[in-house]
Amino acid sequence: MSRPYILISNDDGVQARGINFLIETLRPIADLLVVAPDSPRSGFGCSITSAAPIHYKKLHEEPGLTVCSCTGTPVDCVKLALNLLIDRRPDLIIGGINHGDNSSVNTHYSGTMGVATEGALQGYPSVAFSLCDHREDADFTPLASYIVDLVFKSIALGMPPFTCLNINFPKANKFKGVRICRMAHSRWQHELARRKHPYGADYFWLVGDCEELEPEATDTDRWALAHGYVAITPTNLDVTDYELLNVLKQTF
């Protein structure tokens, strides 16, 4: 049986600890093509570069491993790889491992999820991995065995069209297990902190607090992470609200 071929990108940048831990973990079991931003692109979601050229640079190449940096967004990285750089069809596309939580509302802003979303849109099984720890020196060691297991299961499962998996790990030395769960409902509030520039107009930092809209719910990604479980959320890229669709058909 041939080794799996996996495309990897992220939004923290090609030098980030998370993506390099992922490379180290998967290198013994798979052939890897890594195309990641040349600097952090956190919060870029599914954005693309349309008004500037995109450049890439090959940083490392050996049998079974190619690593490239790209001046574009996480989605640009996936598009570049799929259009120009792959040497065979990837068995899986992975975003991550992200430094920080991408559960609940963060799903919509995440460049890590942007990688998985683009992979799914292009017809490939895709997953996003995130650890609830923003530190540059975050410890990813407890994730290793879970990552390998989840990668093999994701490849074996395939995935229905226009779906991907959002997988978040709590910050812990040991996990209680895995929970399959839905996305919690939340929103960011108090998002801008005003600062005074000594020579001119005010400026702002994006900060904020995450408001939980259903704190008592026990079937969500937020609950799973808060209680020490790995949260796996199947994500559907068809954003049609079919219940409302039927209501509107009767209304208009």
Residue map of PLM features:
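A cross-family phosphate/adenosyl-ligand binding-site feature
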Residues: 2-9, 17-84, 88-89
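Short glycine-rich anion-binding loops that position phosphate/pyrophosphate groups of nucleotides
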Residues: 12, 40, 73-74, 98-101, ...
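Short, Asp-centered acidic motifs that coordinate Mg2+ and/or phosphate
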Residues: 92
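Glycine/threonine-rich flexible loop motifs
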Residues: 101-110
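Hydrophobic/aromatic ligand-binding patch that stacks against planar heteroaromatic rings
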Residues: 115-119
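Electrostatically charged, flexible surface regions
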Residues: 141-252
